[in-house]
A protein has these predicted regions:
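Targeting-peptide/extracellular-domain and disordered-appendage signature
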Residues: 1-218
Length: 218
């Protein structure tokens, strides 16, 4: 049976986090860490923007990509319950990673300096099962990408987060007989981490990220 979790009138604790930064501070799992470490060793971080000062966020534009930065991600997690009392959790993340700064020199539909990778997990807390899947793609030929305007959309193949109306985002991802199809409605203003969204990792200038959360979506 295909598991599809749809928010209708459920109590949901969910959030979106967007982070963009140019320094490698670690990663969410071994595979993504290996990708980042390989990129840094081969190409370094020279030429990319740094999170080195407080900025004024502009939404919805800042929900979209910031290609001057080497890395950013769109991160969703939530807890769900159904009418029978079953409990579920989910996580859906799309990462963008630049290999080199700037635009590719050659003109081709396939040319890119950006790669995207996505993680998708579902936990059946009641049934004590866990599913985890991932995908990788280049940001070319429509295979993967992100935009903030005119409407927010980030995707990798048919896994995506898409604004369907102001303040509402639909998440869709599936693998085999496991999938999510969720509609999240923003209920609170963005929570800015650190100093008005500038989250320092150390005392070194530029060793920081721009980081905000949209919490308590329903």
């Amino acid at each position: 049976m295909r598991l599809v979790l749809i928010i209708v009138a459920l109590v949901v604790l969910s959030g979106l986090v967007l982070v963009q930064y140019n320094q490698v501070e670690g990663a969410s799992n071994e595979i993504s860490a290996n990708v980042q470490e390989a990129n840094v060793e081969a190409y370094g971080t020279e030429g990319f923007a740094k999170a080195d000062k407080v900025i004024e966020f502009e939404f919805p534009a800042d929900h979209g990509p910031h290609p001057d930065f080497q890395t950013e991600w769109w991160y969703y997690t939530g807890n769900l319950g159904d009418a029978d009392g079953h409990r579920y959790g989910y996580q859906f993340t799309i990462f963008r990673r630049a290999i080199l700064p700037g635009e590719p020199e050659r003109t081709s539909e396939w040319a890119t300096r950006q790669i995207y990778f996505a993680h998708f997990t579902v936990t059946d807390a009641t049934g004590e099962t866990f599913e985890a899947h991932e995908r990788f793609s280049r940001a070319a030929a429509g295979l993967a990408g992100a935009q903030g305007l005119p409407t927010y959309h980030v995707w990798l193949d048919d896994w995506d987060a898409r604004e369907i109306e102001p303040g509402k985002v639909q998440l869709q991802a599936s693998y085999g007989d496991i999938g999510i199809d969720l509609i999240l409605e923003q209920t609170k203003p963005a929570a800015l981490q650190g100093d008005r969204g500038l989250s320092a990792k150390s005392d070194e200038v530029g060793n920081a990220s721009y980081y905000y959360s949209l919490t308590n979506n329903t």
